[in-house]
């Protein structure tokens, strides 16, 4: 998993994990554009699977997103996955200036509209009429045209039961939240995805469960202590979002997210991190030596995750190589 960087740096960023043995690279989206980063990476590291994980859906029309994904699928010879998410109201309305009403149903319609565009690029006929998007006009001049690769897979970020069912019904994969510990995955993700798949006459195995695994790894207490503090800060950030509170509550940490939000409102960022105990970290992250990490992740997510994203696989060349060895052991 990588945060988008200046485009001039992406070539090296993509080549390093490929050389280390990773099968793919996933770009998040924040201040920079995940799609542009993926485009540069596709030329710098041919053969590497690339994903947006996740791109913000609503600021772009379904047609624009479909065209971009289509070109990336062509550029990667069929190794691109389109990951989409709603973001939250404040960002979509106040930063992007777009509508956010009923984000779940809107994203469902968005995914179907994107897939209708994929079909139109092959057939020349665009026909999607949904609750939020109506697309019925395309000409050869405004179509990217057919490609040899299959249609891109479309994955969605989902946390609550409705969104998980929607993912099972219309998407090709679901991006689980980084705090998605195994209990949450078993209680909510797998059964709701299966229910959505059944509604659409699909098999649950058709939907990839994509899990970002936070890791604390090192061969000494000192090395792991440093990583633990980094994970603690990330967990404090995630704990400040009300929509994720039920995951913490069900894991036995009721009230933790409320305390984190109190510290956030007061501007006490150190206090936010101080609310994260070692017990929280043991639940939501995986701690191990380098030699034991692959086995620890495989054991933790066996029968749950289809794909594991190494959330903390960043750093210098040696660190990339060691995480690459972990990735190879898990294949």
PLM regions: where:
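Active-site-adjacent structural elements that line small-molecule/cofactor binding pockets in enzymes
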Residues: 1-331
